[in-house]
């Protein structure tokens, strides 16, 4: 006589006990092979990091300016390199990418150098001589991407002087009076980064001017600097505070007129904020003229 089929209630505990046994066995195996599990986890983490680094091209060696992603320049990425030589056109630097174990050892690197120029600095002849003496062939240095024009990269050059102390060669040249500040090519002139960079460069230049270092020993150079600074200030102030002509809006409503005035007022306040440093420069220039007359 056939047995009656087992009830569903009796099958459920058997299934639960079976699943529990599987979990127990897996846990026991993991405990017995804990080091292996840790090594697998570490290997997966390292593999993930390596894939991430390769995805953002940090391990790629750049031999021309066109190799460098636009995003690198926009984010002002710092790259490491080895100086090859200094020419009239700029510095030729061999890029040194991040190396990965077991990959970089057998990977054949392309050959080539990047043409790097000092961003925001116009070197004098004395400045070129000083730079030749300061930097040696094959010297390691960092260059921070700020702009690009054709095949040239405009960068901050950073040289390590021991420990965590890096010297910004762009500012150091200006502090010694071995160059003049110029606009950084390839950089968005309306960005906050532009004003921050030029503020630091102008501060370095003013240090040399106050001490009479380098080219600022000559009174003619000082006068030329003051004249250009004054003209530049007047041009920028007039441009940023240029209000809409009243005759063009005579037919508009009163509300739209007040709105336009309010917008212009806000724009003027922003201009004052952005050019606060130039106000300090004007004050400094006025004091120098006063001392000269005295």
From Swiss-Prot:
The chain crosses the membrane at residues 36-53. This is Protein C3orf33 homolog. The modification N-acetylalanine is found at residue 2. May play a role in transcription regulation. Gene3D superfamilies: 2.40.50.90. The keyword Cell cycle does not apply. Keywords: Acetylation, Membrane, Transmembrane, Transmembrane helix. Its main location: membrane. One of its GO terms (cellular component) is membrane. Residues 244-271 are annotated as: Disordered. GO terms for biological process: negative regulation of ERK1 and ERK2 cascade; regulation of DNA-binding transcription factor activity. PANTHER family: PROTEIN C3ORF33 (PTHR28434:SF1). It is found in: Membrane. It is a single-pass membrane protein.
């Amino acid at each position: 006589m056939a047995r009656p089929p087992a009830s569903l209630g009796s099958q459920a505990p058997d299934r639960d006990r079976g699943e529990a046994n599987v979990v127990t066995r897996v846990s026991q195996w993991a405990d017995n092979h804990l080091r292996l599990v840790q090594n697998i986890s570490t290997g997966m983490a390292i593999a993930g990091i390596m894939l991430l680094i390769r995805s953002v091209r940090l391990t790629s060696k750049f031999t021309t300016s066109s190799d460098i992603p636009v995003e690198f320049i926009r984010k002002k990425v710092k790259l490491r390199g080895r100086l090859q030589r200094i020419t009239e056109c700029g510095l030729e630097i061999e890029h040194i990418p991040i190396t990965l174990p077991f990959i970089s050892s057998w990977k054949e690197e392309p050959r080539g150098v990047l043409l790097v120029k000092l961003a925001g600095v116009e070197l004098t002849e004395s400045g070129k001589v000083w730079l030749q003496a300061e930097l040696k062939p094959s010297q390691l240095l960092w260059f921070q991407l700020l702009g690009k024009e054709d095949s040239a990269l405009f960068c901050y050059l950073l040289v390590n002087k021991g420990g965590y102390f890096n010297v910004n060669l762009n500012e150091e040249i200006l502090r010694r009076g071995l160059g003049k500040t110029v606009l950084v090519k390839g950089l968005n002139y309306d960005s906050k980064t532009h004003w921050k960079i030029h503020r630091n460069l102008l501060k370095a230049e003013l240090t040399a001017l106050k001490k009479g270092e380098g080219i600022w020993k000559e009174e003619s150079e000082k006068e030329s600097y003051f004249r250009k600074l004054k003209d530049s200030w007047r041009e920028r102030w007039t441009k940023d505070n240029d209000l809409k002509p009243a005759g063009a809006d005579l037919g508009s409503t009163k509300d739209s007129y007040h709105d336009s005035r309010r917008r212009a007022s806000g724009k003027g306040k922003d201009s004052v904020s952005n050019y606060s440093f130039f106000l300090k420069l004007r004050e400094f220039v006025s004091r120098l003229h006063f001392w000269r007359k005295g």
